[in-house]
UniProtKB/Swiss-Prot annotation:
Subcellular location(s) of the protein: Nucleus
Listed name of the protein: Homeobox-leucine zipper protein ROC4
Coiled-coil ranges per UniProt: 152-191
Major localization listed first in the record, in broad terms: nucleus
UniProt-listed PROSITE patterns: HOMEOBOX_1, HOMEOBOX_2, START
Purpose: Probable transcription factor.
Keywords: Coiled coil, DNA-binding, Homeobox, Nucleus, Transcription, Transcription regulation
InterPro entries: GLABRA2/ANL2/PDF2/ATML1-like (IPR042160), HD (IPR001356), Homeobox_CS (IPR017970), Homeodomain-like_sf (IPR009057), HTH_motif (IPR000047), START_lipid-bd_dom (IPR002913)
DNA-binding segment(s): 104-163
Annotated GO MF terms: DNA binding; DNA-binding transcription factor activity, RNA polymerase II-specific; lipid binding
START domain mapped to chain residues: 306-559
Region of interest (Disordered), ranges: 62-112
Basic residues composition bias: residue spans: 101-112
Amino acid sequence: MQFPFSGAGPGVFTSSPALSLALADAVAGRNSGGGGKMVTAAHGGVGGGGGGGRAKARDALEVENEMSRSGSDHLDVVSCGDAGGGGGDDDDDEDAEHGNPPKRKKRYHRHTPQQIQELEAMFKECPHPDEKQRAELSKRLGLEPRQVKFWFQNRRTQMKMQLERHENSLLKQENDKLRSENLSIREATSNAVCVGCGGPAMLGEVSLEEHHLRVENARLKDELSRVCALAAKFLGKSISVMAPPQMHQPHPVPGSSLELAVGGIGSMPSATMPISTITDFAGAMSSSMGTVITPMKSEAEPSAMAGIDKSLFLELAMSAMDELVKMAQMGDPLWIPGASVPSSPAKESLNFEEYLNTFPPCIGVKPEGYVSEASRESGIVIIDDGAALVETLMDERRWSDMFSCMIAKASTTEEISTGVAGSRNGALLLVSDEHSVMQAELQVLSPLVPIREVKFLRFSKQLADGVWAVVDVSADELMRDQGITSASSTANMNCRRLPSGCVLQDTPNGFVKVTWVEHTEYDEASVHPLYRPLLRSGLALGAGRWIATLQRQCECLALLMSSIALPENDSSAIHPEGKRSMLKLARRMTDNFCAGVSTSSTREWSKLVGLTGNIGEDVHVMARKSVDEPGTPPGVVLSAATSVWMPVMPERLFNFLHNKGLRAEWDILSNGGPMQEVTSIAKGQQNGNTVCLLKASPTKDKQNSMLILQETCADASGSMVVYAPVDIPAMHLVMSGGDSSCVALLPSGFAILPAGPSIGADHKMGGSLLTVAFQILANSQPSAKLTVESVETVSNLISCTIKKIKTALHCDV
C-alpha cells in the first residue's frame, strides 16, 4: 500500500525557504485579502538602440513601484509597440516619418476579476508554468502569452519581496530585543551598590537575583529550543525560536454532528496560511503551552496539566504517528493475509512477533493477563476532503456523535496544540471526561461486555497535500509519571490503546480513501465467554467496524443534504423542518437505548441488587428515577437487557426484525396484526437505514392513539432496530417542525453483531449475537419503591420476545 508522501522526495515538502508552497499560499491569501495588488509588464520589441534600453529600465522601475503600492489594482502595462498592443498611434507614425524612433507610450489594461481569479488559482497550483501552460492559460483568458508570462514573473517577485521584508522585520525585532537586554544588563552592572556600605558592589555580589533570573531564562530558552526542534521534525521545516507568540482561539464546536457537512465540510477554514502566521510553529507552541485551552472547564478552575512538561506528550504523539503511518503502509510479513489464518474472519491479521521486532514499545510492555486485538481496514468514504473529516475526529462532540453506537462518552480537557494557521495540522488533544480524567468510554452494545475506558492522546498531522493522519495512543503511564492520577470505574474494562487511528487520502473523484488501524490491549477477564472470540477477532471494536460506521454516517449526511432524487425506500412528504425534528427525535431515542444497554456513566442507572427474583444472571436489570427530565416520562424507569447466540445469519435476523408485515410474530405492541407505515425517511441507499413512523393495527374497540417511532441502522459490521411508542398529538407537532425535546419516550430494541469464529465451549460456528433491551415505566411516582413483580415483568417480556423470535426463525433448539 503506497501513499503519495511515500518516497516523494523533496517534491512533497519544498525545501526552499523563499518560495515554499505553504508560504506561497500564505502570501497569496494576504494579497487577495488586501485587494490583490499587482502590475504585469509586457515589453515590446519595437524600440531600439539606447532609447529601447532606457525604456526597459523605466518599465522595470515602474513595475517595481506599482508592486510596492498597496492601493493599485491588477493592471497590464503594455507597450504600444508590443504585438499585443495593436501597433502605435498617430504621433508615433509622425515621429517615424521624420526618422525619429517612436516614443514608447504605455497603455494600461485592467484584468477582469475572472482573469485574476484564474491566474491566482493557476499560481497556487504551479508558480512556474511552462510555455505550453502559459499559452493555454492566455488562450482561455483572452490575454497575450507575454502578459501571462510577466504576470507570473511579477507575482513571484512580489512574493519574494514580501517574504524578505517579513524576515527582515523579525530579525530587526530580535536585534532590538538583544540590544535592550544588553543595555539593561550594563545599567544593572554599572549602578550596583553594596547594601552594607553603600559603595560600588563587586561583580560577584552584583545581583544574585539577576543571576538566578539569567539561569532561569537560559533554561526556558533551552526548553523552547527543544520543543521547536521537535515541532520542526514533524512539520518538515525549520522553526524560529525567537518568533513572537500568537494567541490561538479554540476551534468552534457545532451543535451536532448532523451539521457535519454544513459546518464541517461546506465551511471548512481555509488551508492557506496568512503572512501573519509565517512566524513558524514556535509561536503557536508557545501560545498553546503558555495558555492552556480547557473548553470543558471554567477559567477559574485550575488546569490538570499545569506545571507538566508537555513536550513529553508531544514526543509520545509523534512516535505514535510514525508507527501508525508505517503500519498503514506495510504488508506481509507484518500483516498476514486472512487466507493464511483460517480461524480468523478478518481480511488480514497482525503478526505480533514481527510487530515487536519492528516497533519499540512506546507505552511500555503489555501488562500481565492482557490480550491483544489488532486489525486494519480500508474503504472509500463519501466526504468532500480529508481535512473535513479531520475536523470531525479532532472535535470530541462531533466524533462521539459520528460513532454514537460505539462511543458512550468522550470530551477534551486539554488542547496541547491547536495546529498551524487555524488548521488541524499539528493539533494535539487529551481526550477525557469533564472531571479532568483523560478518557473515552467505548462500548459494545451488550450487557455482557463492560465499557472500555481508555485515556489517550489524539494527534493530527498533514503528511502531504491531500493526505492526513489522526492517531490515538494511551497516556496512562506518562500521566502517572507526571503525577496526574484519575479514578476509573472498577466496573469498566481496563484497556490500553496502542498507536491506532486512520490515514486519510483525497481521491480524484472527490471522495476520501480511509485506512484504519486498530491496536488495543485489554483485560478480558470481565468479558463474558460468549463475546471473547468476537472481541479478539476485531469484529466488535476493530478497524472494520469503525470504517463501516463512518461510511454509513457519511452516506446518510450526503443523502440528507443532496438535491438528488430520494431513494425508493423514502416515502416522506413532510416539511424539511419536520424531517429534521423527526430525525433529531430518533437520534435521541437511539442514544437512550444505547445508554440503557451499556453501563456508561452518561446516565445514572443503578444496578438492582436483591430484587432480581428468578431472573438469570445474564439478564441485567437497572433502574433510575426521572424527575422533571425533558423527553422522559416522570417516575421510576426500569431497563432490562440480555444477549443470546442465534444460529442464523445477521442479515436474515435483521430483515426479520424490521419487516413490518412480520411484526406481529414478536411485538406485543402490534396488537396481533401487521404494522402500517405512516411515513419513512431514508438515511441511506440500502433499505435497512431508515427512520419511520408505524401505526399498529386497531384493537377491537377500534381505538388506537399510539404510533411507533422506529430507527433501523445496518452496515457490514452490524445492525440495530430501535423503536418506542409515541403519542399521535406529539408526533403531529414534531412532523410540523415543532420541538422534539418535549416528546417523552422509552426506547426498546435489538442490536445484532456477527458471531466470532468459535462461540463458547461447544464451538458453535457462525450465527449472530442478539442483544435485546426494553425500558418500561415501573411507577409514575419517582419516590415509589420497586417491587419484585415489576422486575419480573420486564424480564418475562425479554424472555417471551426471544422465544417468539426463535420460534419464527425455526431456530429454537
